[in-house]
UniProtKB/Swiss-Prot annotation:
This is Wtf element wtf7. Keywords: Membrane, Transmembrane, Transmembrane helix. Residues 1-23 are annotated as: Disordered. It is found in: Spore membrane. The gene is wtf7. GO terms for biological process: meiotic drive.
């Protein structure tokens, strides 16, 4: 039997000193493993202290692969289900809802009963149309115009003028509730719309008056 002595040699287990010596006195790191072999030129190989040389094509392919991965992380994905609320979409939807609600307050409702009598409606319509027509009629009476002096083109223009005035009066009368409310809340926009509505009649009136004066005075 072998008798064990009572003295023991200390065991060093530090991570910094974990190393194994090979037969050629080259230190091998247990964590990194064996060093790569390098060609010595005489047919033998020795461990290299530097990393091996990589092929340039392999490096380029590696860079391209990394770039593709990088681009894929930022690729555009429509309507991603990320669980995060898109603030811009919420704001856009709220503005759209407000605009729709705002437009519904001015929707056209023909012959709506807003508590105004028919006489008041007719008076307001005539008040809007008479200033434009009064100028034209006054010019005709000032020149002592007569319907017998109208040419065919004059009668056509006169008919267009009367039709424009009638349609404008009917629209203003039928949609009295809508345009009066619009005029109270948005007077600038209403003035522009009124001018556009009466513009054909105004142009026809001016052209008609010019043709009539030309037929009389040459």
């Amino acid at each position: 039997m072998l008798k064990m002595s009572g003295s023991y040699a200390p065991v060093e287990d530090s991570a910094d000193e974990l190393s194994v010596h090979s037969g050629n006195d080259n230190e091998i790191d247990l964590e990194k493993g064996l060093l790569p072999k390098c060609n010595t030129g005489n047919g033998g190989t020795t461990p290299c202290s530097e990393p091996p040389h990589y092929d340039s094509d392999a490096v380029v392919e590696m860079d391209m692969y990394e770039n593709n991965i990088y681009m894929q992380t930022f690729k555009l994905r429509p309507f991603p289900k990320s669980g995060v609320t898109n603030f811009s979409n919420v704001v856009f939807q709220m503005k759209t809802y407000e605009n729709n609600r705002h437009m519904q307050t001015f929707r056209l409702r023909p012959f709506a009963k807003n508590g105004v009598t028919n006489g008041v409606k007719l008076a307001q319509v005539l008040f809007l149309l008479l200033p434009f027509n009064f100028i034209f009629i006054a010019c005709l009476f000032f020149r002592k115009a007569s319907f017998t002096d109208f040419s065919l083109m004059g009668w056509i223009l006169f008919g267009i003028w009367c039709l424009t005035c009638f349609l404008s009066s009917f629209i203003l009368y039928a949609y009295h509730e809508s345009w009066t409310k619009f005029a109270r809340e948005r007077p600038d926009d209403f003035a522009g719309i009124l001018i556009l509505l009466l513009f054909p009649g105004i142009v026809t009136m001016i052209v008609f008056y010019g043709i009539y004066m030309n037929s009389i005075y040459g």
